[in-house]
Amino acid sequence: MQPPPRHPPIVAKVEQAATQLTAPLTALFAFAVCVIIINLTAAQPLTGPVSRSLHLPVSLSGLVAMLPQLGYAVGMLFLVPLADLLENRRLTVTTLACCALMLALAASAATAPWFLLAVCLAGATSCAIQILVPLAAAMAHPDRRGSAVGNVMSGVMLGILLSRPFASLIEGAFGWRAFYGVLAALDALLALALWRWLPLRHPGSGETYRGLIASLGTLWRREKVLRRYAYSAAVVMAGFSAFWTGIGLRLVQAPFSLDSHGMALFALAGVAGTIVAPLAGKIGDRGHSATAMPVAHLLLLIGVLLAGSAGAGWFGMPIAEHPQLALGLLVIAAILLDAGAVGDQTLGRRAINMLDPNARSRLNGLFVGVFFVGGGIGAVAAGTAWAIAGWGGVCALCLALCALAFVGDLLARARH
């Protein structure tokens, strides 16, 4: 008897690729996106060390964290649509190998321009995440698609939450070049693993590259579900980014006065919120997304109210007299905010991946691009809110954004 082929054939039509997603492959997808997302979100604690080492002026130091994000946006627009045109395994592995090369260049860069170019291109090629997520959705059975997307999305959120403490610890022990070297090695090993274990997937769109790019506007106008969930995700991501931008400023102040290790532990505590992703996916698969989404946004509202109480003294809480209690409440607030954001993301992703299967990568790209913009706006707005009113101002901003998402749920239910 001949042994089965290592890569089972998967035909062109995406929906016929269902039932191919096994538990080990799901774990591989989740691990892959967890590693890749670190390329984008770990730069903030490295801004100071990199700027000093490469003699980057203070006025330009923000480029260290901004350019990977800008590159990612470019990759979303020009590289991700290729997943609806080219064989997905080869595209993913090639993109990730280029990312590893760019990270290695960043680790060895002798001047600031070379470093900034390298991290920008590393950000662009990190869009491999948005090839992997719709690929996992395409491989999953339609009845379990939400659960599959939730499991993979838990990897994304885990990577986001781990990236800053991971970067801080490695930079503190070995320097920033070692951190980028470790990332390059991880991405290279990951590319080899994906080449070995990912199945082939030939998309069936039949479009040209120019046609794919031109179709983005048409898809946005045509798909009401995409617009609904993308707007919701953008608002939620703005609140999520505002919280995590401001909390670092608050925790170094009295009565908390946390050092870098304390900040890392606080960030790790928020990882508990990622367990919501598989649960949210299963709820969506059972047809309860319309109920689950307001619950996710309600968790966000409760988390923000706790954060305002424990960090800004809302509702008369005596923070100075009970600093340990206040810190514990801030941890709970972080977990609730992470859980709400993960739930929103997972339910939105599931809905998007139930739309046109031949445009799945483009739909995911549009969805992510919109909420990515929301996250950037939230981070910038948090800085302004902090300058005006401190942590209380940041929490007020988060509360307004989360309330907007919740009101959107109520309006959507009223229309139906």
Please annotate each region the language model reported.
Residues 10-19, 198-231:
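Juxtamembrane intracellular "pre-TM" segments in multi-pass secondary transporters
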Residues 74-112:
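Conserved MFS/SLC helix-loop-helix module at the cytosolic interface between two early adjacent transmembrane helices
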Residues 75-87, 275-289, 386:
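Helix-to-loop junctions at the C-terminal end of transmembrane segments
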Residues 90-104, 184, 291-306, 399:
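Structural signature of the two symmetry-related core transmembrane helices
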Residues 119-155:
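Cytoplasmic helix-loop-helix junction between adjacent transmembrane helices
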Residues 127-140, 342-356:
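Intracellular juxtamembrane helix-capping segments at the cytosolic ends
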Residues 151-198:
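Helix-loop-helix hairpin linking two adjacent transmembrane segments in secondary transporters
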Residues 291-344:
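C-terminal transmembrane helical hairpin of 12-TM major facilitator-type secondary transporters
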